[in-house]
Amino acid sequence: MKWLLFFGALIGAGICGRDKFFGDQVFRINVRNGDEIRKLTELVNSDHLKLSVWKSPSTFDRPVDILVPSVSLLPVKSFLKSQGLDYSVTIEDLQALLDNEDEEMQHNEGIERSGDFNYGAYHPLEAIYHEMDSIATDFPELVSRVKIGETFEKRPMYVLKFSTGGGKKRPAIWLNAGIHAREWISQATAIWTARKIVTDYKKDPAITSILKKVDIFLLPVANPDGYVYTQSQNRLWRKTRSRNPGSRCVGADPNRNWNASFAGEGTSDNPCSEVYHGSHPNSEVEVKSVVDFIQKHGNFKCFIDLHSYSQLLMYPYGYTVKKAPDAEELDDVARNAAQALASLSGTKYRVGPTCTTVYPASGSSVDWAYDNGIKYAFTFELRDTGYYGFLLPASQIIPTAEETWLGLKTIMEHVRDHLY
């Protein structure tokens, strides 16, 4: 009871001091050729406009989503009109969505004073950690909570290990979520997945047989500092919270910081950029903690990273258009997983290699995993396709988690049957 009251007070205090986005809008822009992509890239790189890219300019069949501050609406509209670029407004007032989200969180805090964790709500970091503790306590024969490191701001990083025994280094699957702080549906889906595993073990033959052969390691919040900052200050924060010497800008993109074509295409050397790659590979302690743990273990067979948004299921590579050696098998597995996911509610996912499905992205977790011998490496971009973007309502958490579970389970079954 006390911890719930404490977190409720934190939420209330955080909401009062958070950045506001009154009148800010999200534009969806359709590009038709390379020249239009170039023009749009010039626009988003205009620092004085303070635009935030939600979906990057990449391919002609993929719309671009850009958050436009209210003070930049007129110049951006003028630019788009002058260049003949078609656009629509998908979010009329960003602050209105944020206010709804805040109200939902406060309402949920009141409900949870009964002591039950609501999986259909977004939670502060400590509430997620408390629930991880509860799962490990309730199912000690199957689950243990493991501290793998500390963040830049000295918060612990916790992983849940699901294992039926058989040695410390059995074949293993890594499930990652929340590496980009603002993608709240990924953290919420991950903690729901943790409860789903323990609930279905010995009841669902699929997950029971998976755990007979492999261990599952689940990191629900891969960027704790950033996640806390999204709830205390800036809901749309993406990066870590490390300090960059010589710059007023904070943090690096933890999914551009891995040693996989580091500092290559799709990254920036500008610390103020949302895709700043960091000073060197693994410069972010959150990334290094995962790398060290996985390398020390030495027997991971699968690495899955949960993100949002766009409804995509991708595999290596992100840093090159070159086909991965296992591309054909990975594509088959991903398509089967997407089909299983769609079987629940009809949610459609696009499947393909990262670089050609969305955009070039060097230094990603999944490419690092693949380059380090973890063959089954996948990225999920969860709901939606842009109507809410990163602000997916809490009412969609459980539907998203339930369908994602079907995709995850399909991949894990394939790993179970194709250990190498």
From Swiss-Prot:
Glycosylation sites per record = 259
Residues engaged in binding a protein? 69, 71, 118, 122-123, 126, 162
One matching Pfam family: Peptidase_M14
Report domain Peptidase M14 positions.
121-415
One GO cellular component term: extracellular space
Gene Ontology biological-process annotations: hormone catabolic process; peptide catabolic process; proteolysis
The keyword Iron-sulfur belongs to this UniProt entry's keyword annotation: no
Specify the propeptide location in this chain. 17-113
Q: What cystine linkages occur within this chain? A: 249-272
Q: Which cofactor does it need?
A: Zn(2+)
- The record's top EC class is hydrolase
Q: Which sites bind Zn(2+)?
A: 180, 183, 307
Which EC number(s) does the record attach to this protein?
3.4.17.-
**Active site located where?**
381 (proton donor/acceptor)
What SUPFAM superfamilies has UniProt attached to this entry? Protease propeptides/inhibitors, Zn-dependent exopeptidases
> Which keywords has UniProt assigned to this entry?
Carboxypeptidase, Disulfide bond, Glycoprotein, Hydrolase, Metal-binding, Metalloprotease, Protease, Secreted, Signal, Zinc
Q: Which domain of life is it from?
A: Eukaryota
What does UniProt give as the signal peptide span?
A: 1-16
What are this entry's molecular-function GO terms?
metallocarboxypeptidase activity; zinc ion binding
Output the PROSITE patterns linked to this UniProt entry.
Answer: CARBOXYPEPT_ZN_1 (PS00132), CARBOXYPEPT_ZN_2 (PS00133), PEPTIDASE_M14 (PS52035)
Q: Report the subcellular localization.
A: Secreted
According to its UniProt entry, the function of this protein is described as: Metalloprotease that cleaves hydrophobic C-terminal residues with a preference for -Phe, -Leu, -Ile, -Met, -Tyr and -Val. May function in peptide hormone and/or neuropeptide catabolism.
The UniProt subunit note reads as follows: Interacts with LXN.
Similarity comment text for this entry: Belongs to the peptidase M14 family.
Q: What is this protein called?
A: Carboxypeptidase A4
The species is Mus musculus (Mouse)
What gene is it encoded by? Cpa4
